[in-house]
Amino acid sequence: PIPESFGTEEQLRQKVSEEDLFKEFTSDENGQNQLPPEEGQKVIDRLGGYDKIYRIKFEAEYLKHLAYEGAKERYGAPLPENVDEHVNFELHVMKTMGFPGYFLIVSDFIRAAREELGVVVGPGRGSAAGSVVAYCLGITKIDPLKYDLLFERFLNPDRVNLPDIDTD
């Protein structure tokens, strides 16, 4: 669960308007290249409307917090520019596809398996090993930048399959 010290979804709703969400969810990771209104509305509808998008945004903010904390641990601070760009891009794709909650859940159960239950979890296999965010969250133990692995093989807006993270 997202700790209360991080804030609440209700607090986010008071700070962020539907217009803000529309722009954020229909633009690229740099806030540029916004989709035309009709196409943008299709994105909003596909994600379940604004009630659902507020939840996605809240989860995305916490995921971003955890990912950047992990990035600093793995790559040092200040982050190298290429790492920051990869993390920012991946987080945007995860958010606009509606998957931040999935990554929070997987991160939580991998951490619990390793640290609390003594369950052996593999270092990462399959296309999820191409995610810098998964590496920063501790889901995988393989640095995709070191091995030039592609995030887009794992998750991209043109791929209709749900993300699949192999944990064995």
Task: Describe each region flagged by the PLM.
Residues 1-168:
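Phosphodiester-processing cores and adjacent nucleic acid-binding clamps
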